[in-house]
Amino acid sequence: IFPAGNEYRRMEFLSNKYNGMHVENISFHNPYYNVELMTDYRRDKGTYQYDQDQDGRFFIRCSDCNDPDTEADYYIVHFTLACDPLPDGSVYLNGELFNNVLDEKSKMGYNFETKQYEKAVLLKQGSYNYQYLFVPTGSSVGQTGPIEGNYYQTQNEYSIYAVSYTHLRAHETVLDL
């Protein structure tokens, strides 16, 4: 009926003293710490692999603080997706870290020298889910298929809205188990 997508990718940086999940390196370049994530690769040609994600959400957390909302620091996080340039469209980062909006803030640039898509983003310490979406030229709709793949086993969260001519009648969130 519609593409299932794939599980979100995960990363976590809770301290500048150690590398977190999916973190290659942390270094300080005044005025921010920089987090270099491990290079990501396309997942559209492989087989489905389950990963317990949070369906695109993020959580502000830090290991060296008592109140993450006020004490967590901001880091510049470097995302890289190694692949050939995808013709006839653009690549975007997606998830709650970008309010699920595909715009210039989430659009990745292609580096022909390193042969990868790259994006640096200022984020607060924590755990993040994200995915890469391909948006064809002339469209505003992101597709998971060309980069993340579509797998029927993917566990998704769906919002169902019952609407009449005048107003919203009901709303329900359903988890695909």
Locate the predicted segments by residue.
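Aromatic-rich carbohydrate-binding modules that target alpha-glucans
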Residues: 78-124, 137-163
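Long, internal scaffold/assembly segments composed of regular secondary structure
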Residues: 1-43
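Active-site-adjacent segment of 2-oxoglutarate/Fe(II) JmjC oxygenases
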Residues: 2-19, 147, 154-169
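Short beta-strand elements
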Residues: 30-31, 36-44, 150-165
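Single conserved hydrophobic/aromatic residue that forms the stacking wall/gate
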Residues: 167, 172-177
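Basic K/R-rich, polyanion-interacting modules in nucleoproteins and related proteins
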Residues: 37-86
